[in-house]
Amino acid sequence: MTASRRTLMVMAGGTGGHVFPGLAVAHRMEAAGWRVVWLGNPAGMEATLVPKHGIPMEYVRFGGLRGKGLKTKLTLPFNLLRACWQSLGALRRVRPDVVLGMGGYITFPAGVMAALSGRPLVLHEQNSIAGLANKVLAKFAKRVLVAFPGALPHAEWTGNPIRAELARTETPQARYASRSGPLNLLVVGGSLGAAALNEVVPRALALLAPGERPRVVHQAGAKHIDALKANYEAAGFAGGDAVRLVPFIDDMASAYAAADLVICRSGAMTVSEIAAVGVAALFVPFPYAVDDHQTTNAAFLADAGAAVLVQQRDLSAELLADWLRSQSRASLADMAERSRSLAKPEATDEVARICATVAGANLEEIK
């Protein structure tokens, strides 16, 4: 069987943290001549996003239990049985050579049926604390891969698959050494915005003397951009070249590479991307993340002196202003170098190679 006739089924859904690394691997496999089919939830973000990438989909209806009411919990056995039956149908139609589970509730019924039907299963856990589905499915998988060491027992540390352009940036040493003048600060609130960052950062910058202030790019999400502008105006910033407020950033690789410091949440993909680029970061974990996984994600870099971790409850304008005063481009460059040293920039290729191996393909098919 040639590589062009081999098929990978990717199971992932629910959030971008599962879908985007799955897409990175999917495109890598397609580039090697593989057929890729995606298994997802018709109500999930993957149903809109994945077809835009030209990848055909199979659908299974299944959702999570966390925070759901009694009715959802009582109907779980029926919903799980239906999802298993739908998954089996998809597996029979697609007949994949290997199934890659990238996380999300959808992976549980599909992963179980893949194992029971004899389809080799590869799992990848993006977070530093494994989700329930992957904890169970790890017992049935041929290979278990993790983005952070220790997330699952007996797993292989591959890192998180990321977009290729993030791994192609100049070294931190070259970037930081070429700069002069005020520091370049990137604040990333994400598509949903991060109210704590949007409120504290403008007030912290106002506490700095004009000569101490960095140049700022602050991304806040389309729904929060007006409130962010009001926060900066209330802090005494009338706009101008030194502060740029944007609802979204299309080219995150360039934005990270242009920054001396990033202030952001610590989702798994954010941490992995920052390490891949090699940029200093101050992480403020989302305090309501499942199992507080954002704290342990950030700790992976912070414990190595490659980032700073501040809990949201401890974040204040005064604390942030004092910390910014204590930093120099040289100190941030050192942090960025440490971050880059912990990155796994070849994660996409490595996960692709492992999938090929499990399917019985030659490694040369993934170049």
From Swiss-Prot:
A single GO BP: cell division
Keyword Signal: no
GO cellular component, one term: plasma membrane
Catalytic reaction annotation: di-trans,octa-cis-undecaprenyl diphospho-N-acetyl-alpha-D-muramoyl-L-alanyl-D-glutamyl-meso-2,6-diaminopimeloyl-D-alanyl-D-alanine + UDP-N-acetyl-alpha-D-glucosamine = di-trans,octa-cis-undecaprenyl diphospho-[N-acetyl-alpha-D-glucosaminyl-(1->4)]-N-acetyl-alpha-D-muramoyl-L-alanyl-D-glutamyl-meso-2,6-diaminopimeloyl-D-alanyl-D-alanine + UDP + H(+)
Keywords: Cell cycle, Cell division, Cell inner membrane, Cell membrane, Cell shape, Cell wall biogenesis/degradation, Glycosyltransferase, Membrane, Peptidoglycan synthesis, Transferase
Cell location: Cell inner membrane
EC number: 2.4.1.227
Membrane topology: Peripheral membrane protein
Name of the protein described by the UniProt record: UDP-N-acetylglucosamine--N-acetylmuramyl-(pentapeptide) pyrophosphoryl-undecaprenol N-acetylglucosamine transferase
Superkingdom to which the source organism belongs: Bacteria
InterPro entries according to UniProt: GlcNAc_MurG, Glyco_trans_28_C, GlycoTrans_28_N
Function noted in UniProt: Cell wall formation. Catalyzes the transfer of a GlcNAc subunit on undecaprenyl-pyrophosphoryl-MurNAc-pentapeptide (lipid intermediate I) to form undecaprenyl-pyrophosphoryl-MurNAc-(pentapeptide)GlcNAc (lipid intermediate II).
Primary localization: membrane
Protein family per UniProt: Belongs to the glycosyltransferase 28 family. MurG subfamily.
HAMAP family in UniProt: MurG (MF_00033)
